[in-house]
Structure formats: C-alpha cells, structure tokens
Amino acid sequence: MLCAVVLFVATVGCTNGMKGKKESYLYQFEGYDYQYAITKDQQEKVFRMTPAKRTVEVLNGVGKYTILGEKDKPLYTTEKMKDYTVDESGKNPVVMVHYALSDNAGDVTAIYTLYKEYMDVEISLENYSGKDAASAYYVREFTKKYQKVEKRSVGTWKFPENDDFPYQTFDSLAWIHRFKDGGSMYTFYEGEEAQPKNYLEAYPEHAIPLTMSEDQKPQEKLHFALVFSSEKDIKAADNRALFAKKNLDTALSFNCTTKGTGSATLYTQKDLSFLMEVENLTDQKKDAEVSCQIYGYDGSTCLEKTEKFSVKKQGNAQKKISFKAPSYGIYYAILTMQSGKDTYKEVYPFAVLKKHTYQYTKSSPFGISGVHFGQYQPNEDTISILQELGAANVRVGLGIPEYAEKDTKLLKKNLASLKKSGIRINGQYLLLDDWSEPLDPKVYEQAIRSVLDDVGDLLDGCEAGNEPNLYATYYGYSKEDYMAYYYEVNYTGAYPAIKDAGLKYLGAGVYQGESIWLEGLDYYGIMDKQDVLVTHGYAFPYSPDLTKDPQVELSFESSLVRTRQFLDKTGDKAWYLNECGLPTTPEQTEGISSGVDLRTQADYMARELLLALSYGVDEIEVYSMFDQQNLYHTIMPEEYENNFGLFYQQDYSGRIFPKPSAAAYANITRLLESVEKCEEISAGSDTVRAFRCDLKKENEELLGLWSTKERLSNDSNKNIVRTPNLPWVNQWTEKETVTIPVEAKSAKVCDLMGNSYEVPVTDGQIEVETTGAPVFVKLEK
C-alpha cells in the first residue's frame, strides 16, 4: 500500500526517559531495539531501547547533508521535509522522504527500508546547483550525549571459485556509539566511497565524511545500515549488530577460549578449546547447522565436525569444541552456518607455536618494520605479539600523521612499554606534520627536535626520510638533482637534531641498494657521518634469489650484492635492512607489482632472512606487522601496499589472525636468535642454496637450505601470473635430496612451522630433502 500520510498515536518515552507520554505521529515503525517516527510537524525522530527496556530519543532525524566551503564555511544543509511516502506492499516498509537543500541548491532523497533488526538507509543528493564546495558531511544530530565512540573497518571473507586462498574484502566502515546506560548504536557505512581515505582518528564522531568530485561537487549517494542494541554484553551486542546488518536471522561467533597472545590467535600449546555460538536475532525459534573443518599446513583435514542448534527467539546456544593440534604451525578453521535459506561462511586462521623463552633479544638481528601505535591500533597486543614472535628490534613512525594524535603522549606511552620489553626501537621521522616534503632544513630540524625532545630517550636510533631515490623517480627529478636536495635539506636538517639527542643517525633507507644513490652518499660525505647505512630490498612477485646480477634492479639478492660491493669499496659500516618482504595481494595476480600466495610469502621471507645474514646485514626488519599502510588502515585486496603484513588487520571483532609468515618468522627467530655469522656453503647441487650459521650456543650450528629447481609461475619475467593456491596445499611439488658433510654427532631437520625430525649422521654426512620452502638443520657437535 502506498500512502502519503499515515496517522498513528503511539506511547513512547521522551528524551528525559519519561514513560506514558502520548504523542501523535504521522508515521511510526517499531523494531526490536529502535523506533522510527515522523511527527505531526514533519520532523523525523529515531528512538532506541535501553537495557532497562525504556525508549529514549537518540537522533533528531537520521541525518543531514552539510556542505562546506573554504575554511569550513557552511554553504548548504538539508532543510525541512518537503513530503514523504510509505510503501508497505512488501515484507518490510519503505519510507521515502524528500528534502530541499538550503537556498534551493539541490534536493535530498532519503529511502529507509525498515527491518525489525535495523534500518537500511540510502541517501541521494539530486539537482545540485550550488557553489563549488571544499568538503561535505552527512551529519547526525544526537539528542542524548553518547559516552564514547569506536570506529572499525569491517571485512567479509571471500572464497574464490578458482581454489585460491580465501581473503577479506571491504564491507563497511563502522561507527559504534556507546551510551552510559549500556546500549549501543551502530552505523555501518557501505560502498566504494566508504573505503577509508584517512586514518580512523581523523573521522568525525558524529558525521560521515563524503568525497568530493574533481569539479568540487559533493558525493551524490551514500548507503549505510543503522543498528541499535539494548544488550549490555558489548561483544555479544557487536556480533549481533554485524549479522543484523547482513540481514541474517542468526549470528555466528567462533573463538578459542584457550589463553593466547592477547587478541592474536597465537598459542603455545597444542590442546585448544573453541566455543561456537549461534544467536537468534528474530522473535521466532530458529534452527541452524554449523560445520567446522580445520585444515593443517601439511594439507591434512585435522577436524571435521557439524553441530546442530535449535535457538529460542532472541536467544543463543553454545557448543564447545576440543582440538589437539597434531603439529606446530598454522591452521585454518572454515566455518559454514546454514539457517533456513541463509548461508554464512568465514575463516578462522590460528597458529600453534613451540613454547620458547628468548635469551638473546639484545643481540638478535631480527626485527619488524611498520609497527604502528594509535587510538585505533591494538597497542598492548602489538607489543605482546612482537615478544612472542621474537622480534628484537622495530621501526616505529614518529610523525604525527602516523599515529594521528595532537601530541606524543600516546606514542610515548607505547614506546616506553616497548622499550621495557627489551626490544630495540629505531624511530623514523618521515615527512612534516602536514605530510608534506620538507623544503627548509631549519624547519625539518626543528620538527625532528620537537618529537625527539619527547621520545628520544626511548630510541636507539632515528631514521630521517624514506627511499629518497625512489621519490626522485616519482617526482621526475634526476638522481643527481634529488641527491643535492637530500643533502641540503634532509641530511642538513636531520643530522644535528638526531645526534644532539644522543641517537644513532640512520640515513633514509635506500630503495634496492641503488648504486648511483649509494655513490652519492659517499660523494657528499654523508656515509662518513651516518652511523648506519639503511637499505630496502624487494623483488615481488619474484623469488628473492632469482638472480644476483647487480645490473638487475628488481631483485632482492641483487640489491644485497650492490650494497655489499659498495661497503667493501668504501669501508664497512653497520648495515640495516629495515624493509623486506612480500605482499599477499589477493586480487592482483598479474604484473610486476602483484603479490604472492600465503605460503610463498613465508617461504620467500625465510630465504630473504638467510640471504641478508649471509651478506653481512646487521639488523633485518620484515615489512610489515599488519596488512595496513602507515596513514590509513583498511582492507584493500587489490592494493599491494595494504597486504605486506605478517598478520591481517585486526578484524571487527578485535581478533588478530596470523598468516603462515608469522608462524615461520617465530620459528626462525627461535632457531637463529643467537646467530653470530652466516655464510653460504656448497650443497653439491647447482639448484640448492645452503647456508651455515654459527650460533652463540656452544656446540651448536645451524644449516639453512632450499631448492631452486622448481620455479613458480610468476617467478619469471615472461610469465608473472600467479597460480591459485590454498594455504593448506603445498605449492612445491618437486623435491631434491642433497648430501652435506658435517662435523656433528646428531642432526635434526626443522621445517618452517617448527616441526622437526632426526636424520642420521653417517660417515660425517647427512642427507637432507629440500623443496622451495627452506628447512633448517640443527647440528649438535
């Protein structure tokens, strides 16, 4: 039925919580935890249900277009309602409301589909004829103050049909408003325009920022879901809201109840307990069936279980699952919930690590770059994870845009915790606070002095800038001209500020150890001044050791060769490789900037660590901690910059899932934390790379080996299309056995996940089976 005006008399609570006051509405809809109404004077009102089951007004209308000019000068906003219609012909009422912008600059149409569980909101700006705008927002007017607001990126698991690895796609950007009485309001902003373009701290608490077109017109459409909860249990409320927004009748949650590493699904015991819970979001009894398959890294199906649930209206039911991991390493739980016509599927990766107490953190060369702190970062968990992984050094951004605060208070607090854990910290001051390139050395110097006055005592060293030789290419300068700028501004400004703070001066990381830039550092005398030479090495999607030809730019080992040759010529110096690694870009499988699959990221990372040690690198930092850039943290499966992480970005529910590379990294640091020297040795085969590592532990030695006999489909200049691969399926099909002479009484082969087996030492020799995934041999003399 389509009607222009519908009259209801409803009993609702007003904003002061009074019950029993009668008000007349032109239209009213009552959901489980909210009410939407249009008053007699054509004002929209939104009410929420409190945990005490009282109805209170929360929003004066759903929102207003607000368009601003330069210096945030107000230009136009949504004025009062012109008319509205209600369509009740379908399962859920649809309300269409028309507004005019002020000064008749355009029209706004709002379409609300009203479900019992939530409101689906579509807003359109039409016939815009106003002035050029600088910015625009969709502003909500709260009639009752909220206690706090949280912001989160929301992802949805996608399962490719070609048997490639599952991955998350961007679903929505969530604002969660918490109220003093325990209730919550959720805004799930969806669509391409919702993809965060800035750090979450910069987003307003009460408004949705809109994009601007090149001709300075505001975004014309936005879509979001509005969900309310009267549930005081925040975790349960958050989960119910997410599934309500998905328009599902039931909600699934799956978590490990065994103590792990903070919010990360990292465990140091094999006996694990999981809790599977199904919640009914409707007022009718619901049946659901949840299947759980857990796959091991070796391809085995370690658990296959289906649980049936019968859940009363608005209720929940739980089932416990016990799991004993047969080996160390990464596991993937695939969960599928079926309820009526609804199907929901997700992935729960977790890792079982060998328990270990690190003893050589002060001297271990292994670190992680791209460690961020901020209001919307898992700060405490980040530090716990670093400790569990055995990261002995980190690089942390110091510029205000990187942690999105007005001062260094939050940064200082977390750096202090990091330092207390024994982890060495190198700060990086990248750009000025407005994220612009410095042009005046004095301005740059003062900016660095300002931050080091606050946090310098917590650092071991400070790096100024990042990959200047690559910036030269981006900006279209010759390397010689940009080197002159680097000397006159970056070095001249940064060096005195860093040295006066009593810190090591780390020159800006040289991308790929480019020879012309290294020679420029020597020519300008910077090499003599800097305490540490910093380089970055990348080669994705190619294997790190595809070639060692120094003339090849996009080659990891070639970058090491170039740097080693330069240091041998100019005089050795401390050398940090504080960026290396590979992205697992799910939706970019072709081209020189494409990524690798999850297993290959771990395998190639292990190769990079051994290669770097063998060329004399003093500190090696894998990039990066999480799948996020330094300025904004969102899910972007098509962008390689957002997929370098050892871990996925923390999900909507607060969980931090590891990739295989996280488990591999933890195992490598456990084996090699006391490494003193690494050198390449012959394995008797042209297609096997082998390395001997001397350890501080008396009577112990470690070998690292892998085979290059098999090359993956994207490990060639001729064909760089990645072959689809599931993370529990070994991508290496060819094996190569080599015989190596050793001076040892026993030998134990360890895989990247931490599992080991004995091999006999016969006549001073051992036989080792190799593939493209490195293995380690622990020798006891």
Regions found by a protein language model. Name each.
Residues G20-Q28, D120-Q195:
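Polysaccharide-binding surfaces and accessory modules of carbohydrate-active proteins
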Residues E23-S102:
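Acidic-aromatic substrate-binding/catalytic surfaces of carbohydrate-active enzymes
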Residues Q28-E30, Q168-S253, Y297:
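Beta-strand-rich recognition/accessory modules
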Residues K217-A236, E758-K781:
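C-terminal beta-strand-rich structural cap/linker in extracellular carbohydrate-active enzymes
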Residues K270, E277-E279, Q284-K286, S682-E743:
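Carbohydrate-binding surface patches
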Residues T382-E388, A392-S450, D454-V455, S478-G507:
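Aromatic-lined substrate-binding rim segments of carbohydrate-active enzymes
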Residues D481-E608, Y615:
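Noncatalytic carbohydrate-binding groove/subsite architecture in carbohydrate-active enzymes
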Residues L582-P583, Q588-Y665, S682-A683:
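Aromatic/acidic polysaccharide-binding cleft in carbohydrate-active enzymes
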